[in-house]
């Protein structure tokens, strides 16, 4: 079984990704995390062969009495940092609709982001 985690808060995008993966792969298990809190929980509880990570995700789900989620433009980076903290080597692909990714208060072009993320780790 090939385990995939999709970290994406937009249900249309996560369904599109799931549909594409299901069309091209078999014997897979896909889990969805729609916010940072859920993604961190899933990463701590399971191993994944591949993680697709949207960089801009909300901090937590919307529930009555929990306060409004904060939209974290680099929330996906927190997932990668959690994997590093856990000494994990799950394969990750970063997804974003923005031309730049914020890393430690600086913006880097998406095409260079993997280098900058590795330097951070």
Spans of features found by a protein language model:
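A short, hydrophobic beta-strand element within the central beta-sheet of small alpha/beta folds
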Residues: 69-118
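Conserved acidic E/D residue at the C-terminus of a beta-strand in Rossmann-like folds
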Residues: 8
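The short loop immediately C-terminal to the conserved phospho-acceptor aspartate in CheY-like receiver
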Residues: 56-61, 70
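Receiver (REC) domain switch-region micro-motif
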Residues: 51-53, 83
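Acidic, metal-coordinating helix/loop segments flanking the phosphotransfer/catalytic sites
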Residues: 18, 32-50, 58-60
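Two-component/phosphorelay signaling modules centered on CheY-like receiver
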Residues: 11-31
